[in-house]
Amino acid sequence: MKHLLSIALAAIALVATPAMAQTAPSTFTGPRIGATVGFSNDKFIGTQAFTYGAEAGYDVAVGGAVLGVTAEILDNRDITRELALTARAGVRVGSKGLFYVTGGYSNIRTYGVTFDGVRLGVGGELALGKNAYVKLEQRYGNYQYGAHLWQSVIGAGVRF
């Protein structure tokens, strides 16, 4: 899954790299909601599982960059709930692509125990028309008591 994500992100980056200096259009600005599905690899309990969730966010264009915030809730078989509040900063790739880094607070609950931590990630987003988008993201979470969580997710959503 990590290799698939790396290949997909590289393909997005190669689509139109010369256009990265352009000013970001309204395609990557405003409120958005979406859903994610993917794979989690928990390095604390030692489990691997399908994960799914929902997110809401807001992005603004600042010159050729895109800055935003995202609130997310996820679930899987062993991690019964993950909440995350993250910021992201990205650059346009061509007219429809966005490459970004993300980071922020995350809280997971597993087997009745709650862990606070930090989530870092890298991702790519592709606009589908004016309002719809798809995305790929690779994430790493570092939590209390030595808990670590890797996630590879894909998502889709709409902007308003």
Model-found features: residue ranges?
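Cleavable N-terminal export/targeting peptides
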Residues: 1-29
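Gram-negative outer-membrane beta-barrel domains
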Residues: 20-160
